[in-house]
């Protein structure tokens, strides 16, 4: 099996349908569109409860210390935005509909449900999810710590930021 970058979701879906590629990973709303178009879904990470990292914040290692204040502010804003999305369904769906060009209420409901089930409120990646990604690259180091630096998130936890978000958005 060869794993390579192939472009955006719509391009990958078209390539699967044409036979140009054999399989691709998609999440909502493309997963629903793929099903509607008769594409066979091999794995659905949500109902199968498979830990996965769908997105991440990537910076050069040196920038973690050199630009720590900027990165901390960025993380705080991203985390609070995630709390808003998880606790204000109407607002989150408006953003999803606009940014992903979703016009179907059913697809919007599925997409939001998928997001809620997969997105940790505090954006902390799980070790299991990172390990599942690393398994795709057996020749690379399988040590999560070689790729994931938790120091900024650990600092936010230690300063009480996560607790403050839980209280503000009444998630605990």
Task: State each model region's role.
Residues 1-8:
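Short beta-strand-to-loop elements that line the ligand-binding cleft
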Residues 2, 38, 53-55, 60, ...:
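Glycine-rich, flexible loop/turn motifs
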Residues 8, 59, 66, 125, ...:
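Generic structural "secondary-structure junction" signal
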Residues 11-100:
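Pocket-lining segment of extracytoplasmic ligand-binding domains
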Residues 65-143:
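Secondary-structure end/capping motifs
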Residues 138-172:
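Conserved C-terminal helix/tail region of periplasmic/extracytoplasmic solute-binding proteins
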């Amino acid at each position: 099996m060869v794993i390579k970058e192939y472009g955006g979701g719509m391009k990958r879906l078209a390539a699967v349908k044409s036979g140009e590629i054999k399989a691709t990973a998609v999440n909502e709303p493309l997963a629903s569109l793929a099903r509607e178009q008769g594409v066979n879904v091999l794995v659905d990470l949500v109902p199968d409860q498979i830990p996965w990292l769908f997105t991440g914040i990537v910076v050069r290692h040196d920038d973690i210390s050199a630009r720590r204040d900027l990165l901390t502010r960025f993380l705080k804003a991203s985390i609070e935005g995630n709390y808003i999305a998880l606790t204000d369904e109407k607002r989150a769906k408006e953003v999803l509909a606009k940014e992903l060009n979703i016009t179907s209420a059913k697809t919007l409901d599925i997409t939001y449900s998928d997001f809620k089930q997969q997105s940790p409120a505090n954006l902390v990646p799980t070790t299991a999810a990172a390990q599942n990604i690393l398994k795709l690259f057996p020749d690379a180091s399988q040590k999560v710590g070689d790729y994931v630096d938790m120091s900024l998130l650990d600092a936010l936890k230690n300063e009480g930021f996560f607790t403050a978000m839980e209280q503000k958005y009444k998630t605990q």
